[in-house]
Every structure is written in structure tokens, then in C-alpha cells.
């Protein structure tokens, strides 16, 4: 459904996590995993093309150019709408991550990662968050809601961090908004 709704950009939320699976899940049978990912991508492409090709034929040359280039790759290099600099998302992060950024326990646990290291769950979240954020920052067209699919990854990351150091102290687990 994602490819039909938003085009191939939805793959940015899936492929980095899939490609980085050996990092977040050591011991994973890589050939089987990669084969499954390839099969899923090809299946999704077949479903999307089953709609896009007849639509392009019916809509004519200009419509075909817009759905296959203008609405996808054309937005990456030279957006016709919402063109913003690569750093545009950075000043918005404090607002997007409020009130989590005010949570002292989260910061303590983040600092503790230097000595404890990253487990598979944290690596999974980072494999989802960081590449997608970096790629969306490089794409010329930017809208704040493009980052909404990253919120679950951040929530999982924050939850895993906090659960790793849980002492059931009200100061650690109480939200800043409370």
C-alpha cells in the first residue's frame, strides 16, 4: 500500500533497516533474509506497476512522465515544491521530539551507552532512524510530516533506553509533561 500511496519514497523507510540487518541482528541467515527482502520489493513493485502502467497508458505521455519521474525522482534532485536546504529539519527536531528531550532519565541512559554499548533493539531503531533522516535531509523537497514515520522508531529507541536503566524511581520514569 505504501508504494501506491506515496510512491517509491516509502522504500526509504524499509530498505535501510533491511540492508543493516546484519548489524542489528548478528547471526541472521543473510542469504535467506536478502532473498526475502528482494522478493518483497519485487512483489511490491509488481503490485504498484500493475496500477501505474495502465494509468500511464490511459493518461498519456505527460501523465506518464509525471508519475514515473516528476512525482518520484524529480522531487529528489530538484523539487518543484517545498524546496528547502539540507539542514532544514535540524532546527525542528527539538519541537518534534518535545517533551521527550526534557526527560532527564533519557539523557542519563543515552550517556550510559558509551560504557554499555548498543544492543540489537537499539541498533534496529538507529538503523531505521539515522539513514532515513539523513536521506530525507538530502532530498530537496521537505515537509515536516515527511518525518512522521520516524516517530515510532524514536519512541521504541527512547523506550528501550529507559527500560534498560529502569529503577522505578519517579524522577526517572515520570514524563516532563506530568
Language model regions located:
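Transmembrane-lumen/periplasm boundary regions of multi-pass, lipid-linked membrane glycan transferases
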Residues: 10-144, 153-164, 173-178
